[in-house]
Amino acid sequence: MAFQPPRVALLIETSRSYGRSVLHGVARYSRLHGPWNFLLTPGDFAQAPPQMRDWHGDGVIARTLDQQMAETLLEMEIPTVFLDYPVDNLPRQKYRKERCVDLTSDSVGAAQMAANYLLGKGLTRFAYAGYPFQRWSISR
């Protein structure tokens, strides 16, 4: 039987810089360590195709804000990487660490780096204006 590259669904928004950067990194990894076959549907956070349950892939990399979408991905029982998703919100009986991981940014480290930079410039009065319901923003 001929080699079949892994099939990986990329459920990542393509309309924002962060999503495009993630896609660029995944593509680079695939070039170095692959090849992988990708399933990518351009769009925003709620972009999983309705037939996702019937897709027979080998893994998923997802940035979703939708609880139902996250649970659907877990029900597929394939390795899943969640980007900045609060996995604490997932039902314990569905979430299994051996096949699911949550990749988050170091928000505290980013905040410290920004503060140190501003302090190094002699600024002592500054503030952060973030997004109220974004996990990464709240931590900063």
Model-derived features: positions:
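Bacterial carbohydrate/catabolite-sensing allosteric modules
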Residues: M1-I61, M69-R140
